[in-house]
């Protein structure tokens, strides 16, 4: 299973490449778990960089493993915080926490409300409030998005829209939560890799190894 392989590679890199002595640098963060096999991984990295820059004035140092050099991994411990994009990066983040006392936050956010909550969590670790204007903008957008469910009811929608979400574990988890928040019933949550490397996976997220079984599930959606 490729997710297990990614987990082991990330651990191998952070166990062997970083120098023993690391001098902390201010306003620097790392991203862990940006596998280029992930859907729109480069876009996610770009989005996290923009969020951290606007909210806290932080810049990215090392990104495992997207456009990162051996030297950057060698001094990965100089950053103040690690942002773990995927569950596969969690064990590596634990290693770095033990080696260099580096805190971390797990998962990239989906949706305005989740982004706001995520920024507040990061801010608590950094000891810095996120940018006030940015938070106000996100809060307004979150309110507008949440009102979509109410508008649909006012327009006389008789049937709740249903969806199936398929992808990597963190995408399925985050996107499903966002869809529920706007009034869409997520009927099926299908992970495209096994859950062996996931710590305490959500019970309603399934891994189906047989493609025909997955197709049969999706065919059922045509009748909803």
What do these predicted regions represent?
Residues 1-224:
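An N-terminal assembly and electron-transfer interface module characteristic of large anaerobic redox
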């Amino acid at each position: 299973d490729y997710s297990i392989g990614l987990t082991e590679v990330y651990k191998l890199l952070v166990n062997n490449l970083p120098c023993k002595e690391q001098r902390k640098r201010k306003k620097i963060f790392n991203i862990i778990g940006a596998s280029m096999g992930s859907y729109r991984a480069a876009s996610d990295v770009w989005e996290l960089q923009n969020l951290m820059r606007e909210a806290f004035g932080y810049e990215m140092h090392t990104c495992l493993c997207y456009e990162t050099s051996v030297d950057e991994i060698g001094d990965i411990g100089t950053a103040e915080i690690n942002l773990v994009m995927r569950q596969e990066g969690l064990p590596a983040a634990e290693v770095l926490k033990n080696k260099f006392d580096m805190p971390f936050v797990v998962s990239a956010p989906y949706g305005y409300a989740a982004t706001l909550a995520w920024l507040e969590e990061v801010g608590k670790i950094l000891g810095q409030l996120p940018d006030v204007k940015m938070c106000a903008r996100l809060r307004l957008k979150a309110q507008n998005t949440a009102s979509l469910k109410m508008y649909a009811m006012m327009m006389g929608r008789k049937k709740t829209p249903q969806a199936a979400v398929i992808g990597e574990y963190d995408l399925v988890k985050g996107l499903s939560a966002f869809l529920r928040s706007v009034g869409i019933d997520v009927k099926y949550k299908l992970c495209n890799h096994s859950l062996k490397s996931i710590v305490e996976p959500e019970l309603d997220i399934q891994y189906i190894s047989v493609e025909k079984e997955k197709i049969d599930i999706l065919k059922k959606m045509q009748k909803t």
